[in-house]
Structures are given as C-alpha cells and as structure tokens.
C-alpha cells in the first residue's frame, strides 16, 4: 500500500514506548521488552504477532478484545510493518483505542499561532499516554517480513501469527514474496512455539487456495477453513475471538466479495 510520508511520524515514534525500531536487538528478548514478571515460570505468557499490520486497526481492536477475555490475560501483542508512515498511523490508532477517543478528536488538538493549543485537556492525556499501564501489553515493530526470524526466537513464546489481507502477489515470478509462501513459513517455524498457529484471511480465492498448499507442504494442518467468513458461525466460534473487520475487509464486503479464512496449526509430531 502506498502512503505519503508524514512529517510528524519520526518524532512521535522515537518518543513512544510502543515503538521498537528494526535496529534493536529483540530476538529472545521480548520478555524483557514487555517487562514480563511471571515468577520464574518460563512459559507463563504468550506473544501473538500480526505481520503487515497497516494502519493498526486490527492490532488495536485485538488489544481491546484480549483485554476483555480471560483466555488471553497473559497474551502480549506485536504489530509489525516495514513502512514508517504506517507505523505512525498504527501508533495513533492504538493510542486512540486506549484513550477511547476518535481520530477526529485526536486531530482537534491544533497548535495556534500564539503557540498555545486547542483542547488542552486532551493534549495532556495524549502526552502522558506512555505512563498508562495498558501500554505494557502491546508494541509495534519496524521490520521486514523477509528477515522476520531475525527479531524472534523460541524463548519469545510466539504462539500465533495473524496474516490479514496481505499482498497476493499473483504473478508467478513474485509469488515467493507472499507472506504465506513456504520460504516464509519456514522462517516462522524458526521461532513459533506452543500450538504454532497461523490465522490467515484474504479476499483473494486463488491466493487462499495456493496458500493452503504451501501450509500443507510444510506440515501445517487445517484446523478449520471457510470461504464465507462473515456467515460462518462455526469458524467464528472456533477462532475464539470475534471477527475484527479491518478497512480492507469492509471494502471487500461492501463490494459483495466473500472473505476466505483459515486457522493452520503446525503438526510437528
């Protein structure tokens, strides 16, 4: 997705506890990054990641969903993208969710000619957001999926990956770029732990069917699949969380396009 450079992004990311730069050494260190205290129990936490999070609608909604679900009380979330402007938008989206404010309210904070600001109370809330406890369970990472295994290891307890509406790369010469391609799946298995789940959604039927073959070839089992996500109650129940409709998904649904989805679990027996 093409997106214009935004002047405010660099400073906002640099000063946010949410943001982890691609230059940081994170492999097998996410427990320390999240400051997880599990009383010496090595595996008493899980990390779920979304690769290609875009503007952050999914991870911010997932964060709120997990916060209200005891099943995910020890689960931490990382949204990943390689485009700095996207990371900036995702940062604001997450902050807005935590503060329970709209994008429009956030944008109402305007610096006036005399140097003062409109909506001072909200401005102070935003400035102090790094001190909110909720921030302890979510991060955004600037990273390229091509070397995703550089940022995660087995000690990080990454048990689930979300892949939502990633580029289908339909031309044969580009298919290795797919986030579901076998080369990527092998990289994910370098660090996936526990159940080793991948939740995959796309509007592209051919991309979905070819991806099913990739998963099968590497040794993943299909826990459940659907070609009509919105109307498949069995799938939604199996997923364990409500379906979070992103901007892409809404656009496709408005056009009458069915959503394909699958939960794939690695069979290492």
How should these model regions be labeled?
Residues 54:
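Conserved glycine-rich SAM-binding loop
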Residues 83:
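Conserved SAM/SAH-binding beta-strand->alpha-helix loop
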Residues 195-202:
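Conserved beta-strand signature within the Rossmann-like core of class I S-adenosyl-L-methionine
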């Amino acid at each position: 997705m093409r997106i214009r450079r935004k002047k405010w992004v660099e400073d906002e990311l640099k000063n946010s506890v949410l943001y982890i730069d691609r230059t940081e050494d994170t492999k097998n260190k996410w427990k320390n990054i999240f400051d997880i205290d599990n009383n010496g129990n090595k595996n008493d936490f899980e990390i779920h990641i979304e690769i290609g999070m875009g503007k952050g609608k999914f991870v911010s909604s997932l964060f709120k969903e997990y916060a209200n679900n005891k099943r995910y009380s020890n689960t931490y979330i990382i949204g990943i993208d390689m485009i700095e402007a996207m990371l900036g938008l995702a940062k604001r989206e997450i902050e807005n969710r935590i503060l329970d404010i709209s994008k429009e309210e956030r944008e109402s904070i305007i610096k006036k000619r005399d140097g003062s600001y409109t909506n001072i109370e909200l401005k102070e809330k935003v400035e102090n957001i790094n001190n909110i406890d909720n921030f302890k369970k979510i991060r955004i990472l600037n990273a390229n999926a091509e070397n995703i295994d550089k940022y995660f290891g087995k000690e990080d307890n990454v048990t689930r990956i979300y892949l939502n509406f990633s580029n289908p790369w339909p031309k044969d010469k580009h298919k290795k770029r797919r986030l579901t391609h076998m080369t990527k799946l092998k990289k994910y298995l370098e660090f996936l732990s526990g159940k080793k789940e991948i939740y995959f959604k796309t509007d592209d039927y051919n991309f979905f069917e070819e991806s099913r073959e990739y998963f099968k070839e590497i040794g993943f089992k299909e826990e459940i699949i659907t070609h009509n996500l919105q109307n498949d109650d069995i799938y939604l129940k199996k997923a364990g969380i409500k379906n979070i409709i992103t901007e892409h998904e809404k656009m496709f649904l408005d056009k009458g396009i069915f959503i394909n989805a699958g939960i794939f679990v690695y069979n290492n027996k």
